[in-house]
């Protein structure tokens, strides 16, 4: 059987597997098909967790003080601790940005957040992406308390790979059995 024939039949096989509630006893299924199904299910689950964490993060950044005080979500409670991390890391820069925002409230502000680089024992440099994303979330949370339109700062300063590392961190901490 050629590979093009196999590719054309694969969706049909998957449909048959999903349509049949239970395989008859004694029947066997090609291990490649089982692996394909498992990969597909894992990708769907991972995408669901990732999009849920992004949705929780976006919701957190738009919550007012009363909603934050009354939340029962452990992830949001953790996000709330990131504000102090941002203050400790960025210090006076937070106040300077807030001053600029108050001075020109209708202007789009370009906010570039610096990353703290750590020297490794091999005399190279690295940035811990999870810690950086936590500090940026805290920084954006502080800005949004003044006026909740600054969520773009998060996505302008954080690369996709850094955000993915953060999502993996949250998934590992809160969604692992």
Swiss-Prot record:
Q: Name one Pfam family in it.
A: Poxv_Bcl-2-like
Query: What are the inducing conditions?
Result: Expressed in the early phase of the viral replicative cycle.
Print the keywords alphabetically.
Answer: Early protein, Host nucleus, Host-virus interaction, Inhibition of host innate immune response by virus, Inhibition of host IRF3 by virus, Inhibition of host RLR pathway by virus, Viral immunoevasion
* One GO biological process term: symbiont-mediated suppression of host cytoplasmic pattern recognition receptor signaling pathway via inhibition of IRF3 activity
Q: Where in the cell is it found?
A: Host nucleus
InterPro entries in UniProt:
Poxvirus_Bcl-2-like (IPR022819)
Listed GO cellular component terms? host cell nucleus
Q: Which domain of life is it from?
A: Viruses
Q: What is its main location?
A: host cell
Q: Which purpose does this protein serve, as stated in its record?
A: Plays a role in the inhibition of host innate immune response. Within the host nucleus, inhibits activation of interferon-beta promoter by inhibiting IRF3 activation.
Member of which family? Belongs to the poxviridae OPG036 family.
Could you tell me what this protein is called? Protein OPG036
